[in-house]
Amino acid sequence: MLKRASFVEVNTASLRHNFSAVKSIVPKDAHIMAVVKANAYGAGAIKASEIFLQEGANYLGVAALDEALELRSHFPKTPILILGYSPNANASMLIDNDLSAMVFSLEQAEVFSQMALKSQKRLKVHLKIDTGMHRLGLEPNFKSIETIKKIRALKGLEVEGIFTHLSNADAKIKTHAKNQMKAFNAFLEQLLDQKIEFQYRHAYNSAGILSLCNGNENRFLNLYRPGIMLYGFYPSNEMKESCPTILKNVISLKAQIVQIRSVKKGEFIGYGEHFYTNEETLVGVLALGYADGLMRALGNRIQVAINNQLAPLIGKVCMDQCFVKLNNIQAKEGDEVILFGDKSAKANDASEIAALLNTIPYETISTLSKRLERVYI
């Protein structure tokens, strides 16, 4: 890859540490699906997957076909599940690349089966059950049992898994999450009563792993799906404050100062007259902008770390560049700037940036552009 003056630094030791944290919580005989959608939440899907597989991951989880195909080109034998919706038009690519798909309707299952039979193959599928998130899935009721019987009878499919998704397991009060698991477990018991079993049964995301593995709600589960915790973040501030598990920061957004210029008093910096120089101002220009994932709204709102000093980000963030004020800062062209990342360097971490923008760290890191090089340390 061509070098740029901005990049995402990824701490591989932290990736390994966080995966080990998952292994220390889930049952010893459990399978682990490392969720690496959205370019591994910004960390780089190929390298992150390689590390998780080395550490013992049994499965990889993504959201869409393009993500799955990228992984398949590097990991020809690794099980890969597309957790999101797969259009019928994608069926042949799912089959040809030995990918597993999420299914939630008989109609789609029939299309997938027909396509698989034409290829003289079988497509692996996982059935999605909606236990209370009300997004996608079959309802956990008698009608769905009949639907599942019909899906399992389709000769072009291998129904290897069944799963649900917890919508609120990161809350302080776990009532909704426990009710979801109660519904899922009851449904699994009804299926077992009719001798319907699955190789994989899964429900716990990071929030479930961190907060619900000490009860018996997971008694039927044998596969766990860690996501955000692998990249060093807790699913919510409540969990961060109460959870004994230590997670380590993985991602830092960095850029070099490409030019330093002195701007006289009484000038505006950047687009739209959003920063006025009320004194002679030393301005450092960074080759990093909102097209790279540095939110435009952060201009005039955060401080960045330069040589263990804090300097304000000024003006509006441009598409490809931004500005820092260097008055009283020891810095030169080529010096490294940490926009967010490891707090040991005085920088904000992604959760603090997210709080400032009234969002979550998932968004802060997963929107980091692929045009930024990932540098692994």
Swiss-Prot record:
Positions of the catalytic residues: 37 (proton acceptor), 271 (proton acceptor)
HAMAP family from the UniProt entry: Ala_racemase
Q: Which cofactor does it need?
A: pyridoxal 5'-phosphate
Q: Which residues bind substrate?
A: 135, 319
Matching InterPro entries, A to Z?
Ala_racemase (IPR000821), Ala_racemase/Decarboxylase_C (IPR009006), Ala_racemase_C (IPR011079), Ala_racemase_N (IPR001608), Ala_racemase_pyridoxalP-BS (IPR020622), PLP-binding_barrel (IPR029066)
Q: What does this protein do?
A: Catalyzes the interconversion of L-alanine and D-alanine. May also act on other amino acids.
Q: Name one GO biological process term.
A: D-alanine biosynthetic process
What are its E.C. numbers? 5.1.1.1
Q: In which pathway does it act?
A: Amino-acid biosynthesis; D-alanine biosynthesis; D-alanine from L-alanine: step 1/1
Q: Which organism is it from?
A: Helicobacter pylori (strain P12)
Q: Which residues carry this modification: N6-(pyridoxal phosphate)lysine?
A: 37
Which family does the similarity line name?
A: Belongs to the alanine racemase family.
Q: What protein does this entry describe? A: Alanine racemase
Keyword terms of this UniProt record: Isomerase, Pyridoxal phosphate
- Provide the Gene Ontology terms for cellular component: cytosol
Pfam families from the xrefs?
Ala_racemase_C, Ala_racemase_N
Catalyzed reaction equations: L-alanine = D-alanine
Gene3D superfamilies per UniProt:
Alanine racemase, Lyase, Ornithine Decarboxylase, Chain A, domain 1
An example molecular function term from Gene Ontology annotations: alanine racemase activity
